[in-house]
Amino acid sequence: MLLVWSLALLLGAVAGKEVCYDRLGCFSDDSPWSGIVERPLKVLPWSPADVNTRFLLYTNENQDNYQQITADSSRIQSSNFKTNRKTRFIIHGFIDKGEESWLANMCKKMFQVESVNCICVDWKGGSRTGYTQASQNIRIVGAEVAYFVDFLRTQLGYSPSNVHVIGHSLGSHAAGEAGRRTNGAIGRITGLDPAEPCFEGTPELVRLDPSDAQFVDAIHTDGAPIVPNLGFGMSQTVGHLDFFPNGGIEMPGCQKNILSQIVDIDGIWEGTRDFAACNHLRSYKYYTDSIVNPTGFAAFSCASYSVFSANKCFPCPSGGCPQMGHYADRYSGKTNGVGQKFYLNTGDKSNFSRWRYKVSVTLSGQKVTGHILVSLFGNAGNSKQYEIYKGSLHPGYTHSNEFDSDVDVGDLQRVKFIWYNNVINPSLPRVGASSISVERNDGRVFKFCSAETVREDVLLTLNAC
C-alpha cells in the first residue's frame, strides 16, 4: 500500500494535464488539485456536458413543482424567479441528486418563513461515480454556480450579496469553488458536514474556507476519521462560525451497523446511504428544522465539547449566542474571527431543536439518599421532568445541573419538584426545595420558593418568590 501511495505521489510530480471549456475556463490536474498527499491521484473533472449541472427553481408560487432554469434572460424572466428576493442555492453531495426529497423539503420550510428563490442544484451526472472522480467533478459544479451568479449580476443587476449557497458534503466544497470564482462576493455559504476525504488538510484553494463568501458557516456532524471510523465529514474548521452539535462525531439516534464499517467509500450507492451515513445526513436535517425553530439551536462558545458537557459554557455572553442553521447570520459577532467553534445538543429525531436551562435547587427537610427532578412551567409551554441530582440529599445544600428541553417554556411561571429513592423507609422522610432558580441561555434568572416538604414521589409546586 505504501508503495502504491509513493508511486502516486511521484506521478503527481509529473507535468499536469489541462482541459478548457468556453464558459467555465480551464481545469488542471496540477497541485493542489491533484498530486498532493490528500489527493495523490491525477484526475481531471468530467466535462460540463457529462456532469450536467441543472438549476431547479422552487418559489413561494411553485412550491411543489420545480421550474428548470438556465443562465438565459428569457428563461429566467418566464419563470417565477424574483429579483426582489433572496436566492438560496442548495447543492447535494456524493451519490445524491437534486430531485431528492430533502432539498425540496428544505425549500418548503423556507417558504413558511420567507419569500425566496430556492434553487436545487442537480449534478447527479457527476455525483454517481467513484468518490475520487466526484470530488473533482464538484469543480465543474462550482464553476456552473459561479457562472449563474455572475449572469444574475451582469444581466439582471442582481447582487451576489443576496445569494446564499448551501452545500451538503461534496456540495459544501462546490459552494466554496463558486465562492472562490466570484471573489468572495457571495453573501453567505453554509457547509453542511463538508466532506473530509480529499479535502481535510488541503490548501484553501481546494476546499471551502472563510474567504469564499462574506459569511461562511458550517455544521459538523460526522467528524470521526474516515479510516477506520468511516466518518465522512471534516473535523477541521472551514468557516467564520463552525458548529459541532453533540460534539460533531456521533449524533443521537444514529447507531452505525458494523456492516457499514466495511463499505468502501467508492462503493456506497444510494440504497445504503441512510444505512451507512446517518451522522453525515443529520447536518441537513438539523438545518431544515432550524428554519422553523429560530431559537431552538442556540450554540455556545466553548473550548471543547467535553467542557460544554461539564456545564461550563452557560449562559450566552452579553452579545448573545449564534443559532446553528438558518439564522446563524443574525449573530452580531458572526465575522469577528474565523474558525469560531460552538457547541450544542440536539434531539435524537425531528424536531431536533432544544432549549438549554440551568436549574439550581436548594434542599430542605430531612437527610436521605435519592434523586431530585424538576419540571418547568412557562407562558409558552411546559417541560417534562429532568434529573438535577442524585446522591445524598442534605438540607441546605444546593445542587445545579443543565439540561436541554424539547420545549421552549418561555417566561417561567412556576416549577415542580419531586424526589424518589425506591427504598422502603418506615419513617416516611420528607424532602423539599426551599428555593429553585432557573436560568435561560439569555442569562435571565427566575426564582421560586416553598416552605413545604413532601414524601417520596409527591409533587411539590414552587411559585415565584
Swiss-Prot record:
SUPFAM superfamilies: alpha/beta-Hydrolases, Lipase/lipooxygenase domain (PLAT/LH2 domain). One of its GO terms (cellular component) is extracellular space. Induction: Up-regulated during hibernation. One of its GO terms (biological process) is hibernation. It catalyses: a triacylglycerol + H2O = a diacylglycerol + a fatty acid + H(+); 1,2,3-tributanoylglycerol + H2O = dibutanoylglycerol + butanoate + H(+); 1,2,3-tri-(9Z-octadecenoyl)-glycerol + H2O = di-(9Z)-octadecenoylglycerol + (9Z)-octadecenoate + H(+); all-trans-retinyl hexadecanoate + H2O = all-trans-retinol + hexadecanoate + H(+). Residues 1-16 form the signal peptide. It comes from the Eukaryota. CDD domains: Pancreat_lipase_like, PLAT_PL. PROSITE patterns: LIPASE_SER (PS00120), PLAT (PS50095). Its main location: secreted. It is an enzyme of class 3 (hydrolase). Disulfide bonds join C20-C26, C107-C118, C254-C278, C302-C313, C316-C321, C449-C465. Pfam families: Lipase (PF00151), PLAT (PF01477). Expressed in many tissues with highest expression in liver. During hibernation there is a significant increases in expression in heart, white adipose tissue (WAT), and testis; but not in pancreas. One of its GO terms (molecular function) is lipoprotein lipase activity. Residues 355-465 form the PLAT domain. Its EC number is 3.1.1.3. Coiled coil: none annotated. Keywords: Calcium, Disulfide bond, Hibernation, Hydrolase, Lipid degradation, Lipid metabolism, Metal-binding, Secreted, Signal. InterPro entries: AB_hydrolase_fold, Lipase, Lipase_LIPH, Lipase_N, Lipase_panc, PLAT/LH2_dom, PLAT/LH2_dom_sf, TAG_lipase. Belongs to the AB hydrolase superfamily. Lipase family. This is Pancreatic triacylglycerol lipase. It comes from Ictidomys tridecemlineatus.
